[in-house]
Amino acid sequence: MDEKEIKFIQDQIGYTFKNQELLVQAFTRRSYSMENGGQDNEVLEFIGDKALDFVVVKQLSEEFGHYSKKYQNWEKWGKTEETGTFISDLDEGELTEIKKQLVQKNTLADAIDNLGIAYYLIMGKGDVEKNIQDSLSVKEDLFEAILGAIALDSNWDIEALQDSMNVMLNPGELMFDEDVNYVAEIQAWSSANSGNIPLHCFYPTSMQGTWYMPRHHMCIYGKAEQDTHFACEVLIPGIDYHFVGYGRSKNLARMDASRLAYEYLKDEDMLFSIRDEIDDPNYNDSIGQLEILARRGYFSIPQYDFKETHDEDGNPVWNCKCSIKEKDTVTNGRSSSKKDAKKQAAYDMLTFVLEEE
């Protein structure tokens, strides 16, 4: 892994390593270390798994909880602080469900895909031949290993861990019912337009200091608020403008910059519709086409449920139901072939989502 690759990864995850060997280790699979010696990322995965649980619970308590009393602390220049009992807007079951969604395998794997960093995995020959980097479990492991490496490199700096988790995971998409997830929209647009993901550069800034405002590019700027601590510059392949957003965290700054980019694309009539994504909707490719739309953020990964019955002659008949979390409709396929039943259910669902648009 060279310096250019390390810089790209650090820009994407929103953290700069003091000890870059930890970052390289986070990307090193056991298959490589078995063949070449050195340390792999398995212990970092273990550390990152525990760190992820902690920072996600911390985030949930901050987003949905508050204390029963407030007071002004005059020893801190009248700063408003909280005390008393802790009150949560969500109950234990609701918090547990959100946490479960945030830390599950598919969520972490999707985050690695959105960051575009699985390509940099360091693998042994067997893993390379099997294209193991495409495995959901491997991407999940990579996410946890990176967070574990950050935990060690930062000496367990909770703010650094939470910051990086927010940048990598974008948890607001699951915690809040936003009309538009600007980060995901821009990532999907860039991938569809150029095959590449946007680049993110983060800079510390404050009302007391000098705002980060690059002058060497055409830029569109967000609005800086009083409690702003970070700037994020988003660069989209094929777009001349750079977009600079501000926020009290790196994640909020990235969201602001992505919003600016989204509004620019919308004003320029450059946004794709769901119909633009699939050139030729057809029965034979329907399963893959439906998954492409899901991977690009239009809806969740389709779920297929199968049931085998038999006709009067005892021949197998397969029934397949296709459902999508965000859609009320369930489509059905029926065939003597399990694969064809799945295709029929997928094609009917594909037709439904395209017509719905």
Curated annotation (Swiss-Prot):
It comes from the Bacteria. It is an enzyme of class 3 (hydrolase). Residues 198-267, 285-355 form the DRBM domain. Mg(2+) binds at E45, D141, E144. Its cofactor is Mg(2+). Signal peptide: none annotated. GO terms for molecular function: metal ion binding; ribonuclease III activity; rRNA binding. It catalyses: Endonucleolytic cleavage to 5'-phosphomonoester. GO terms for biological process: mRNA processing; rRNA processing; tRNA processing. The active site is at D49, E144. Keywords: Cytoplasm, Endonuclease, Hydrolase, Magnesium, Metal-binding, mRNA processing, Nuclease, Repeat, RNA-binding, rRNA processing, rRNA-binding, tRNA processing. The keyword rRNA-binding applies. Belongs to the ribonuclease III family. Homodimer. This is Ribonuclease 3. The gene is rnc.
